[in-house]
Amino acid sequence: EGLADLRDRVLPEVAEIRARHEGQASAIVAHGGVVRVVLADVLDLPDAAFFRLDQPYGALSVVDWSDGVPVVRVAGAVLYSPA
């Protein structure tokens, strides 16, 4: 799947989740590519920057949409000690 196809599949689903849970905290558990798509979108990054977003396995990223404008609070945080 190419980046454009991934973006076209992911962003409408994220918008639907946000609409369904408006005003509530929500969690999306996904692989790194999906997380990169969301982060790149909210940061208005070009496709060339996609792989410059580090998203390790099991990492946490947090986007706050509370005022309708996305703010990245955490990106790619690893909260465990890798073996």
Regions found by a protein language model. Give the residues of each.
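Acidic, low-complexity terminal tails and accessory targeting/binding regions
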Residues: A4, A19-Q24, D41-A83
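Amphipathic alpha-helical core segments of compact helical bundles
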Residues: L11, A15, L39-D44
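Generic beta-sheet signal
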Residues: I17, Q24-G33
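Internal catalytic-core helix/loop-beta-alpha segment
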Residues: E1-H21
